[in-house]
Regions:
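Acidic, PIN/NYN-like endoribonuclease modules and their adjacent C-terminal/linker elements
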Residues: 1-30, 36-39, 43, 66-122
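Acidic, metal-binding active-site segment of PIN/NYN-like and related structure-specific nucleases
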Residues: 42, 48-69
């Protein structure tokens, strides 16, 4: 497992990813560690994910990227962030899953430390 879907991303997206690619390395935050980080604040969650080597995937463009950048500037860093752009509807699980699976097949071997990517890519 390498990717963690945050609470803003539906479990339906996770299921759609797994239908496209049965071994896709994603888990929903509610299913990871018994859901104990579902309500964690972004800086706390990013720090925990860094310890576990998990890249967060979500829609929280406004605060997640800001907090990730702050952790990087402070020297603490993060394990990586993938955010969907505004053009991707939160209800379009098919588009989300296709974008994520296609992107991950290309990006899985990248150095993800302190990296933030947006889907679709420009």
């Amino acid at each position: 497992m390498r990717l963690l879907a945050d609470s803003h991303l539906s479990r339906r997206c996770v299921q759609a990813c797994l239908r496209l690619q049965p071994q896709f390395p994603i888990v929903h935050i509610a299913d990871w560690l018994d859901g104990r980080h579902c309500i964690s604040k972004d800086p706390v969650l990013l720090s925990v994910l860094r310890e576990h080597g998990l890249i967060i995937v979500g829609f929280d463009r406004r605060t997640m990227a800001m907090h990730a950048g702050e952790l990087t500037k402070a020297g603490a860093g993060h394990a990586g962030v993938i955010l969907f752009r505004r053009s991707v509807s939160q209800m379009d699980y098919g588009k989300q899953s296709r974008l994520l699976v296609e992107f991950w097949n290309e990006a899985k071997d990248w150095d993800w430390a302190d990296r933030i990517e947006y889907l679709p890519r420009s």
